[in-house]
C-alpha cells in the first residue's frame, strides 16, 4: 500500500483502497444521510444540514458514529511500561477507569497519531460466600486511534511492543459518541445510574442487557459527552434507543468537524502531522513533566531539542 511504504502490515490489512461500510451504514441511509468516503469508510457527512446539526449539538445532544476509529486493547504484565516507550504521557500512573489523551511519537519528534488511552484493567469481584476478596486482573489498556491512521498505528505498535504484551484490534466493535449539554440527561434515561458518578475522562464497563458496553466520558466537540463502545451487532439497536430520546439526533461528520474547529481541538492530518512536534502543535500538555525529564520514549531527543530552543512555529486557535 502506498500509504505505508516499506512497512509489513501482514495479512491484517485487506485491500485498504476499497471503501468499507460502517456497521450502521444502512441505518444512516434510512435517516437520510449524505454519505461520502472518509478515512477508508463511507461516512455520513450530514443529514439535515451541517449548521442545523452543529447548533443542535451545542444546545441539545448529538449522536455521532465514529466506528471508523481504531479500538485496540493492549494487555500484559508490562503493558504500561511498553506503552510508555511509544507515548510521552504518564501511562503507569493512570488509574484503572481513567482516560488520558496522548500521542504516538516518531523518532523525528513528529506525531504519528493522537489517541485516547484508558486503563482498562478489570476488577475481579470476590465471592462473599467463599470469603474471597476482589482484586485487579491483568493490566489492560484500551486505545482509540484515528480511523485514517489505524492500520499504520497497529503496524507501529506491533513492531515496537514487546512480545509478552498482546495487542488486539477490536474490529467487531462499533463506537458511538453522544455529545452535547443534554447528553448525560438522555443517557441517564436510557441507562439508569450508570453515569451518575462519572466525571470527565472516566471510563466504565457496563452490561446493558446482553450488550457489553464501555462508556467513557469524553468526546471531541468541546461539549460534555460520552463515547460508547458496543459490539457491532448491537450498534443499530443502541443508536435507535438513544435517538428515541427527545434531546438526541444523529449528527454527521461535517458538524463534527465544525464543532471541533470551534472548540479549538486539533485534527490529525491537518493541525498535527508527522512533520510537527508536540511543542509546535501546542500539545505540550501531553508531555508530562516527569516523562520529559525521564525520556526513554521514541522521539524524546528530538522533542528535547525543541523544548530547549523553542519551536520554530506554533499552532494557534
Residue ranges and their predicted role:
Residues 2-102, 110, 121:
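Acidic, proline/glycine-enriched N-terminal capping motif
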Residues 4-37, 44-45, 120-317:
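Conserved, structured C-terminal
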Residues 70, 74, 112, 141-148:
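Short coil/turn segments at secondary-structure boundaries
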Residues 77-113, 183-211:
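Internal amphipathic helical hairpin motif
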Residues 116-117:
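Glycine-rich, Trp-frequent "lid" loop and neighboring beta-strands that shape
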Amino acid at each position: 500500500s502506498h500509504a505505508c511504504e516499506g512497512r509489513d502490515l501482514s495479512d491484517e490489512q485487506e485491500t485498504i483502497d476499497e471503501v468499507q461500510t460502517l456497521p450502521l451504514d444502512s441505518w444512516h441511509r434510512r435517516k437520510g444521510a449524505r454519505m461520502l468516503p472518509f478515512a477508508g469508510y463511507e461516512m455520513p457527512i450530514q443529514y439535515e444540514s451541517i449548521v442545523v446539526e452543529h447548533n443542535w449539538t451545542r444546545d441539545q445532544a448529538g449522536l455521532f458514529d465514529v466506528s471508523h476509529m481504531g479500538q485496540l486493547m493492549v494487555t500484559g504484565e508490562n503493558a504500561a511500561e511498553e506503552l510508555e516507550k511509544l507515548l510521552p504521557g504518564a501511562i503507569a500512573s493512570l488509574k484503572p477507569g481513567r482516560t488520558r489523551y496522548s500521542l504516538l511519537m516518531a523518532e523525528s519528534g513528529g506525531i504519528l497519531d493522537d489517541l485516547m488511552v484508558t486503563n482498562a484493567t478489570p476488577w475481579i469481584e470476590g465471592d462473599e460466600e467463599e470469603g474471597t476478596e476482589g482484586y485487579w486482573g491483568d493490566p489492560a489498556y484500551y486505545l482509540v486511534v484515528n480511523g485514517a491512521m489505524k492500520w499504520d498505528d497497529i503496524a507501529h505498535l506491533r513492531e515496537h511492543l514487546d512480545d509478552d504484551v498482546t495487542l488486539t484490534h477490536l474490529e467487531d466493535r462499533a463506537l458511538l459518541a453522544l455529545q452535547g449539554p443534554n447528553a448525560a440527561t438522555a443517557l441517564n434515561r436510557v441507562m439508569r445510574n450508570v453515569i451518575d458518578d462519572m466525571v470527565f475522562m472516566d471510563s466504565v464497563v457496563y452490561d446493558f442487557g446482553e450488550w457489553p458496553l464501555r462508556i467513557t466520558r469524553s468526546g471531541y466537540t468541546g461539549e460534555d459527552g460520552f463515547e460508547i463502545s458496543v459490539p457491532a451487532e448491537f450498534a443499530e439497536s443502541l443508536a435507535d434507543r438513544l435517538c428515541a430520546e427527545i434531546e438526541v439526533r444523529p449528527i454527521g461528520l461535517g458538524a463534527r468537524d465544525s464543532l471541533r474547529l470551534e472548540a479549538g481541538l486539533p485534527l490529525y492530518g491537518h493541525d498535527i502531522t508527522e512533520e510537527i512536534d508536540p511543542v509546535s502543535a501546542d500539545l505540550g500538555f501531553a508531555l508530562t513533566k516527569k516523562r520529559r525529564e525521564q525520556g526513554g520514549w521514541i522521539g524524546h531527543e528530538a522533542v528535547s531539542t525543541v523544548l530547549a530552543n523553542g519551536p520554530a512555529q506554533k499552532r494557534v486557535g
